[in-house]
Structures are given as structure tokens and as C-alpha cells.
């Protein structure tokens, strides 16, 4: 199973959100509101980082 993360670039923030992609979007949105940008991603077995999407703070 894939483990999804919400990350904020240029910080140490890397939140594990488990195995359900749907659970990641609310956390991603909240972190984007606080830090300006956040991204939902996962890591392949070879270590490659795969981005599923992101939010920007445009409010």
C-alpha cells in the first residue's frame, strides 16, 4: 500500500496521512493556508518522490 504525506517545501514539515489519499487534502489545504504552499506526495520503492497535487494560499 502507498503511504501518503503532506509536505511543505523549504521546511521540515512532512506529515504522514496514512494510506487514504482522500484524508490528505484537508491537511494539505490547512498547511497551505498557514505556510503559503503544501503538497500531497508519496515515495516509490526506489525512493522517487511522486506528487499527487498541491494547494497554494490564494485567499
Give each language-model segment a name.
Residues 13-17, 21, 50-52:
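Local beta-strand/beta-hairpin segments that build beta-sheet-rich folds
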Residues 18-42:
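A short, charged, amphipathic alpha-helix used as a generic interaction element across diverse proteins
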Residues 33-59:
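Short, mixed-charge low-complexity intrinsically disordered segments
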Residues 1-13:
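Short aromatic-glycine-(Arg/Gly/Cys) micro-motifs in beta-strand/loop hairpins
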Residues 9-11, 22, 29, 45, ...:
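Intrinsic-disorder/low-complexity regions
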